[in-house]
């Protein structure tokens, strides 16, 4: 009776230690935040970064339909504005060696929920059958009156992608 009891205690201690080590390694991120500006002049003028990566998490500010000078594009056309937002988000994800497959939260703000619901199926092409969590929020207005939609993302990059990005010159076999 004493031997099975000791074996059980040993297994419990070892498994707790492994769980603790894994939790500690996930919380031990020693990298500094990496800031990314998609349109540096615009973002500096308004005082924000379009994206910030800390360890394996990326927070992406709301994308709106604008040109490189910060002027609204596709004015009055919510569907095209949405496509422009996703195009900008794709550029940001690519910068971080990531994709829409890594998106875990997507929040959409729109001034015309009815029209958005008509064109929301475009997202099927982006996410396939792996949709992120998130919210669709109808708002009175966005930063400029011409903006009809704004999309913000949170991304989780796998450890494998992080290692490839952080050590591109090393062989990852």
Language-model segments: which ranges?
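Surface-exposed aromatic
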Residues: 104-106
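Sec-dependent N-terminal signal peptides
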Residues: 4-13
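N-terminal presequence-like segments and the immediate start of the first folded domain
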Residues: 16-87, 91-96, 101, 110-173
